[in-house]
């Protein structure tokens, strides 16, 4: 109910007429109504703008996690090789019945050796035949499951290299990265690539090359030119590389490095840059490590270190800000995972026998490319619910 307008005693003394006051109150009311309408309109416009921004972020800047590990992007011939990888290994390095029987136990022992007994192991453990065999049948196979899935989903422009390009894989062990690249990127199979593989274990290098040649034969492809280099990170390589790769390398180096992780990241960045052909404006490097907090911390630090040297991140996040999930003590770390439901049946069976089943494959990674002017356009962020 509207309050009846009346003159106050002081208004009467001032000579104000009732009709003038009524008119003034009506104008005031109209003004307030207009102000409220404007506020509501501005609020609605702002809400719509925020919705539009969120929509743009989702459609343009944020890719859902399944895009990073879509299995349908894996070439069919690669799927077959991964499914039957145990047969590939058998064709190059067959095991007798007793060795096959002992394999799950040896894999379990190797797992303890790589985790619980970190401080006691030597970096040259791959020179031991039993450990090498266990590593190939379990870790290399799982590495291919992870890496082929990842490489198949990274933007194809990242792998658009010229014919006769030089690649270098650091600490390849059993050629996990060269194998994964050969399987996941059919366009690279057609190119004449010289692939340098650096590792401290000559035995592992020879083992890996035999498997690589066997895979190339099964795919009926001309293999890349493989150059094995026995040595540790920092050892000289004959040619500068257009493309450098590393997987599970720094996770092991951390065990023998007493300095803080930021010092290690800076040192390793300088060593990797020394291998790259820096005059090539499209020089590339990809680092892949296990998705544990310590490895993710190092990957995050390497990301920052490479950006400061004029490289930009191509995947997973292309922004130039500090990583908000940098793995500092007590904080969240950046890692990506996918379910292993469609992993090879024999691999899952072997994992069960070894008491090392995997429900998810997890990794932390960054792909870099040298920018022309140290600048990039756009921002793609992948998110994972952990």
Question: Positions of the model-derived regions?
Answer:
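Conserved SAM-binding loop of SAM-dependent methyltransferases across substrates and taxa
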Residues: 174-189
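C-terminal lobe and adjacent flexible extensions of AdoMet/dcAdoMet transferase-like proteins
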Residues: 344-386
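N-terminal auxiliary segments of SAM/dcSAM-dependent transferases
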Residues: 4-121
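Class I SAM-dependent methyltransferase Rossmann-like catalytic core
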Residues: 121-157
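Conserved class I S-adenosyl-L-methionine
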Residues: 163-173
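S-adenosyl-L-methionine
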Residues: 207-238
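A short SAM/SAH-binding and catalytic strip from SAM-dependent methyltransferases
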Residues: 242-262
